[in-house]
Design a protein with these regions (language model features):
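Short, flexible loop segments at boundaries between secondary-structure elements
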Residues: 254-256, 308-312, 355-389
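A transmembrane-helix-recognition feature enriched in membrane-embedded lipid enzymes
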Residues: 3-65, 374, 386-391
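Short helix-loop-beta junction
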Residues: 92, 115-120, 294-302
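Phosphate/Mg2+-binding loops and adjacent switch elements
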Residues: 102-250
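Walker A (P-loop) phosphate-binding motif
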Residues: 49-105, 225-226, 393
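C-terminal accessory "lid"/substrate-recognition subdomains
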Residues: 1-26, 194-335, 389-393
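Acidic beta-strand-to-loop metal/phosphate-binding motif
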Residues: 335-343
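Residue-level signal for inorganic ion chemistry
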Residues: 40, 80, 113, 172, ...
């Protein structure tokens, strides 16, 4: 299954004009089936949206404001780091947020959020029926009347205390989750590969047509430091083609330190891998960004093993990893280290503890870049204004 997922991902990220010259016969044999599925996907999307527009499917309204964080394409767009960033904005303002997430893929993202937000009043509700999950949390903790809490000072330095009651809901991967009404739609775009091959799933990476950008209230271009000025301009042009007035912000996933597998309470500075022999192992949506960031830290050599997004490491995978580490040790006459992301570690931490090699976990956090007149404060102001527009009339 993992091999099939990798094949489909390679097709989805390859321009059709290059298929014949770059893809293997096995890849090419899948294209007719994927094309058929993709042609059926669009009318299914339209039909579903039409059911909501006609009221045949009901859109549920929560008693608190809802911030949706989603994307137009799958994989590596920084949704979960942005969810955490927004949650911290509200926590710092004294408003306990409720994060609503599906929790698929071994719940690696849920575990990471739980660790990062531990000790804060943020709550994490997990399940496909996020309206029902939210209802359970509202009954358990209560909620704050938004007209009394989300005023102009909410995201400023003058904090208010709301106890344990929920003041806002943050919808993780919410763009296609039409069941919940939202106050603000934040759309994440991966600057390194923004639109894949411009085709719909499963032949491409698009979960909706480009016209869906019209629904965006805010667009965040993630991994913005890894794209050229021309690439950033091309992304801006595409976004503004469908949504002329939408504000665009830029973010990065900034590394802070490493933790050691087997002793995660011990942190290591980033400089610890300078001049080291490394094997980067990941099962995330944007492995290239991970490897490039490791390269910037100055190791002597970087090798990589990529698995499909959310892949759970099995014993056979550990054997492959161990053999690659043995080879690196033989080639360089030095003991290599393995580096993984937090998502990979939290998916199955126990399988990484007995490799016989040191395993480091790269810890990072999302930051809004000061770029093109936008920065973290202007993003918070934009968020605040949208919540005021929709809830405080």
């Amino acid at each position: 299954m993992d091999k099939l997922a990798r094949l489909v991902t390679q097709i989805a990220n390859s321009p059709p004009s290059q298929w014949l010259s770059t893809l293997s016969p096995l890849h090419l044999s899948l294209i007719p089936l994927l094309s058929l599925a993709s042609s059926l996907y669009l009318p299914a999307l339209h039909f579903r949206r039409r059911l909501y527009a006609l009221g045949l499917l009901r859109q549920h309204r929560l008693p608190v404001p809802v911030v949706s964080v989603g994307n137009l394409t799958w994989g590596g767009n920084g949704k979960t780091p942005m969810v955490e960033f927004i949650a911290r904005c509200f926590v710092d303002s004294g408003i306990p947020p409720l994060i609503l997430t599906r929790g698929y893929g071994g719940e690696d993202e849920v575990k990471m959020l739980e660790r990062h937000l531990q000790g804060t009043p943020a709550k994490i509700g997990v399940g496909a029926n996020r309206a029902a999950i939210a209802s359970i949390y509202f009954q358990r903790y209560g909620y704050i009347d938004p007209r009394g809490s989300l005023n102009h000072e909410t995201l400023s330095s003058e904090n208010i205390s709301c106890g344990d009651k929920i003041g806002v809901a943050i919808l993780d991967d919410g763009m296609q989750h039409l069941r919940l009404w939202r106050n603000i739609e934040i759309v994440m775009v991966n600057a390194m590969i923004p639109w894949g091959n411009h085709l719909l799933l499963p032949l491409g990476t698009l979960r909706e047509p480009f016209s869906a950008l019209k629904r965006a209230d805010v667009v965040i271009v993630h991994h913005a430091d890894m794209a050229s000025k021309l690439e950033i301009q091309a992304i801006e042009s595409m976004v503004h083609k469908y949504n002329e007035s939408v504000p665009i912000f830029f973010s990065i996933l900034a590394p802070s330190h490493f933790i050691r597998v087997g002793n995660i309470s011990y942190t290591c500075p980033l400089k610890d891998i300078s001049h080291a022999i490394l094997l980067c192992v990941s099962a995330i949506g944007s492995a290239d960004s991970f490897v490039q960031r490791i390269h910037k830290m100055g190791p002597m050599h970087v090798d990589r093993l990529d698995f499909s997004d959310h892949h759970s490491f099995q014993p056979k995978d550990i054997d492959i990893i161990r053999k690659r580490l043995h080879k690196l040790e033989s080639d360089f006459s030095a003991v290599p280290m393995m580096v993984v992301t937090e998502k990979d570690y939290f998916r199955r931490p126990e399988v990484l503890e007995h490799l016989g090699y040191e395993v480091l976990v790269l810890c990072s956090s999302l930051q809004i870049l000061p770029l093109k007149g936008c920065n973290e404060e202007s993003f918070k102001k934009c968020l605040r204004q949208h919540l005021e527009i929709y809830n405080l009339a």
